[in-house]
Amino acid sequence: MRRVIILLAFGLLLRSPAAVAAQDPRLEARLDSATRARVEAALASARKEGLPTEPLVQKALEGASKGAPGPRIVDAVGTVLADLRRAREALGVAAAEDELVAAAAALRGGATPSMIGEMRRVTPHGAVAVPLAVFTDLVAGGMGTDAAWRSVAELARKGGDDEAFLRLRERLEPASPGSTPEAP
């Protein structure tokens, strides 16, 4: 018995730091082992590609909270990973984590990769996280994709800063649930 314990302890010491880092205790507590292994494989892929992992973890935890079956959780995590990859393609390898997350959400909200790239080109200093988040919020609030994009892109072309984008969102979001915002 003592020999088994020593071998197990030695095995733990030999595990790579990357393998240990890949394990998220939140996932261990909420997912079955098969689902967790597949989600952790997606996390490892994201890390290897320099993509943020927290959106993947959050999607897995969301699925677990809703009682989704393991394969559905894995599919949802894979979709988020694919969105982050598309965001990276649209923004380039130098994109910051917050920009990738915002771009992935904007893509899910109806933006195209070319729209994301355009935003990078026209936004002062190339910072796109806030403009893309505002676009996503407007679409989620009921504004049509085209109208929301025109509003955000126009402000970007005019050199709007983050505060201006947040004011745009406040101005264009519906005043009450169910009402539809209008484009300027």
Which role fits each region the language model picked out?
Residues A18:
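Glycine/proline-rich, flexible active-site/cofactor-binding loop segments
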Residues L7-R15:
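Bacterial N-terminal signal peptides
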Residues A21-P184:
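General marker for long, soluble alpha-helical cores
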Residues M1-V4:
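Positively charged n-region of N-terminal signal peptides that target proteins for export
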